[in-house]
Every structure is written in structure tokens, then in C-alpha cells.
């Protein structure tokens, strides 16, 4: 079979996406693929333009497949339709969109999704909050951009699973530690922040949790520093990123997620080899670290 050419479009280069990019390249090398990774700097217009340029290139220059994690929850429907019409396979990674089933009616190319269960990840974080705050309290949530599918789904899951006697305040950030540090620092300067009332901080990734923690610990007040050192911080990420933070007591607990890229690439290659559509949607695993039962003993 001719060497497959695959382009991977990632929204940014945060810790999770960096790992996705590394896995794309190493898996591509192992399987003998022509693999290219591009990034959109969290800009949906940039991502759309990058992909359309590839789709509209000459037939000789076009890839066999695009593996895409959309920047926003809208999910690049028109771009996906253009790709499939041009005979390019379309794979959604780490997100869910509402048009995959429709596109799969065209048997020309593989179309499928490999994703984290973002809603379930949020539910796990909500259960961690419940384990740590059985009497209720106030939680500072440091979350990704409003238009991000990941941010929306994780928030909804967390909100459903957390106890009703837990109140949340949300800070918005880009998907980086530095952005979370800046957002939290700016919020602390507001007269209405009332930082002292919060009994837990939950980040939608471990980077957001760590960035917020650094900002909160930068206070000049010894009493406030002591408070934040004793406050539970929660994060989300792959095992190699979050377990050392929990073991090092930077985070109290984390939701451990999995990368999607390896499964997406291997599934795609098999689809080309067998000329058959893969399952429409595959979900990778997530779990609490430590286990929820053990976490309840930490309160």
C-alpha cells in the first residue's frame, strides 16, 4: 500500500497537546506514515484556514487523512464536508461533533471520532469535590475558554456531580499555566474577589491548577500563604503529568485521562487497510487518582 500521508491539526501546544503531537510523530514513524502536525494557537479562524488550504491544494499534495481536534465546540462542519468531498478521511480527536454520523453515509473515506469522555471527566472531578467537601463550601474553578468543547463539557459534568451545597466561582483562562497564573492574579486584585472564602481550587487541567496555585501563593500575607498551602487543588491530565504532582502534594487529587492520538492513528490505518468504516465513536478511559474512597479519607 502507498505510504499514507496524514495531517494532524491540534488547537495549541499545552502539555496534553504536546504529548498528542509527540505520539502522532512517533506512531507515524513506527507505522511508516508521512505525518505532519500543525497547531492553531487556540484560534478557530486560523485552524479553519489552515485546513482549507490543505484541502484545496492539488490532488498530489493532499493528505489521505486529517486528524483534527477543533478549537471550538462548533467543530468545523463545513471544513469536514469539504475534506470528505475531496476524498480526505476525517477523524475527530478529543472532541465530539454532531455531524460525524451524517458524513459516514458517504462510503468514500473513513470518518470517525476518538475522544476522552469530557462530560465523565467533569463528573469525576465533581465527585472528587464531593469527597473533599462533604459539608459543602466554596470552590474556585479555573476553566478553559468559553467556546471550547472540552471546557463546556467538563464544566457541565462537574456541575452535575458536585454537591448542591457547594458554590462555584469560575475564572476563565487559555489552556496554559501562564495564562491561569495571569487570570488568577488579575482576579485577586479585584476588591470583590474575596479569595479567603474558598476551600478548594479546581482546574480543568493540571496546568490551570498549578498556574492558579502559583498566583495564590504569591501573596505577601503569611496567613494567606498558609491558607493556600493547606487548600486542596484539583487538576486533570495524563498519568505521567498529574501523578507526580499529586505525589508531590502540589495537587490533592487529579482526574487521570488518556491520549487519543495513538488509537486514532492505528484505527485510521486499519480502516484504509480493510476498506471498512471503523466504529463511529471510541472513548478512552479516565479515572480518579487517588481513588475516590481513598480521597474521602484526606478531608
Give the residues covered by each predicted segment.
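Flexible loop/hinge segments that line or gate small-molecule binding clefts
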Residues: 78-120, 239-245
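Short, solvent-exposed amphipathic alpha-helices that sit
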Residues: 16-31, 121-125, 149-167, 179, ...
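Short beta-strand elements in bilobed, periplasmic/extracellular small-molecule ligand-binding domains
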Residues: 29-44, 138-141, 162-181
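Immediate post-signal peptide segment of exported/extracytoplasmic ligand-binding proteins
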Residues: 1-6, 29, 133-136
